Amino acid sequence: MKPPSAQSSPAAVAAAAPAMDSAAAADLTDVLCEFDAVLADFASPFHERHFHYEEHLERMKRRSSASVSDSSGFSDSESADSVYRDSFTFSDEKLNSPTNSSPALLPSAVTPRKAKLGDTKELEDFIADLDRTLASM
């Protein structure tokens, strides 16, 4: 990456993008100038920085974790992971289940999902292990 002082001037940016209208070129110039300022700020010693990135990062983390309110004792990352896992499962269930707004399917067209052969064996093994554990208590 080029150091901030070697970055292109706003006029060079505007000339390099002839297909953009002037508003888009101005927006791009503003974003690039802001990016250059942030890079220059990161290049400066910590005590001379103009912006407080750590405070901003912590505030954004608090704001994003506030949307995942969970009083179960899990950490934010654990609860966020479970939310994503649940949302994927929920999405899959919603996709595979008929809704009131979907057209009614004929009973012959609906085929239930068959259980896998290993499903019952695993469950039986778990129950047997649980019975042995309880018997030893």
From Swiss-Prot:
Its protein name is Regulator of cell cycle RGCC
Q: Name one GO molecular function term.
A: protein kinase binding
* Main location, first listed in the record: cytoplasm
GO biological-process terms attached to the record? cellular response to hypoxia; complement activation; fibroblast activation; G1/S transition of mitotic cell cycle; negative regulation of angiogenesis; negative regulation of blood vessel endothelial cell migration; negative regulation of cell-cell adhesion mediated by cadherin; negative regulation of endothelial cell proliferation
Q: How does it assemble?
A: Interacts with CDK1 and PLK1. Interacts with SMAD3.
Location(s), subcellular: Cytoplasm; Nucleus; Cytoplasm, Cytoskeleton, Microtubule organizing center, Centrosome
Q: Does the keyword NADP apply?
A: no
User: Where do the record's region annotations for Disordered lie?
Assistant: 57-116
Question: Where are the Phosphoserine residues found in this chain?
Answer: S67, S69, S71, S75, S91, S97
What species was this sequence derived from? Mus musculus
